[in-house]
Amino acid sequence: LDNKIIAFLFPFFLLPMKDLLAKFENKRPEIVFEWKDAETEAEGWVVINSLRGGAAGGGTRMRKGLDKREVESLAKTMEVKFTVSGPAIGGAKSGINFDPQDPRKRGVLERWYRAVIPLLKNYYGTGGDLNVDEIHDVIPITEDYGLWHPQEGIVNGHYRATEPQKIQKLGQLRQGVVKVLEDAAFTPDLRRKYTVADLITGYGVAEAVRHYYELWGGRSVAGKRAIVQGWGNVGAAAAYYLASQGARITGIIDRAGGLIKEDGFSLEEIRQLFLQREGNALTAPNLLSFDEVNQRIWSSGSEIFIPAAASRLVTRQQVEQLIAGNLEVISCGANVPFQDPEIFFGPTGEFADQHTSVIPDFVANCGMARVFAYLMETNAEITDQAIFGDTSRVIRRALERTRQQSDSRTGVAQKSFEMALRQLV
């Protein structure tokens, strides 16, 4: 490199992580699309943080009380996630402020997608997210409006695919995302017809833990104790895959209650707890009250913690109790699990990162984003083993890059963020 260029770039390389983050967080998004439903009180936003690589991607969520700021922060989270999962595109998110339990939900979604279809045709790819289901909501509604697949905007905007390429990529997406799992190694029950979309995120969260132990000290997950927060698709699947590797799930805390078993549940017990869920809720005859579990679980001692419930729930006090109980690694199933107002890295997250190994959300839970990227590759092999193996390799590569920076077991999240942001800022 020319000396002048080095002199120009030098301050940039020295920018501390905090400054990089502030710069990225405070940059105005390129596109904000605002919508007000004509028939109900629903309102919504598409935030496209950037059209990096000609397109942007991010799911559609619905919840009462959601605002534009939440959508904007999630769009920025997606942009960071794409640095790990690929493709090299911008981050986006759609959010609708409406009660998902309201019987008018379907009509709201239909009118929403009618309004945003031009974006989805050209440069924005979406999918399911909180309270919006990929397979039952997004795909059928957008199909009715002439979209071949909710990721079509990325195929057009980023890949600039020719007609035959477009047919291949969209065909792979249509087949792969809803693919029913046929390999007993990847599903708790073949008869239940779970799909790739149901299980891939939780699988990635568990694989992140396995790769962490191998890369930092050549250790195994077997025999390690794990606590799981949240028993939806991500938490329950992560627990199932960890138990399959020999980890001992010693505590589960869910919205309505939980379970604690100090010597750990057997793989078969975890499998049954997975299969017996009601919707996304933990059910068991011996369920403890939320208050009792919340009182006991944080100090019960475990090496692994999987936050996989809603965002911003985990408090500083809970982290301190976990650390005192011999915690070694946190694999973030939830986006932004720590109770900080900051978009990415607040004081609680920073405290955790300084005292234990934190695998950040954009690495640990990038499974679904990675499946989309994989299925847009030319001639993707659509088998359970190929799809799950690809997600596992991508997560491992991201952790390997962080490990090459330092063998320290703290600061893992900070180093991972820094490497991602240098690609974006």
What are these regions (language model features)?
Residues A7-L15:
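Hydrophobic alpha-helical signal peptides and transmembrane signal-/tail-anchor segments
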Residues E39-R52, T83-A88:
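N-terminal glycine-rich anion-binding loops that anchor highly charged ligand groups
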Residues T83-V221:
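Glycine/serine-rich phosphate-binding loop and adjoining beta1-alpha1 elements at the start
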Residues G257-V358:
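Rossmann-like adenosine-cofactor binding region
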Residues I323-V425:
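Adenosine-phosphate binding glycine-rich loop
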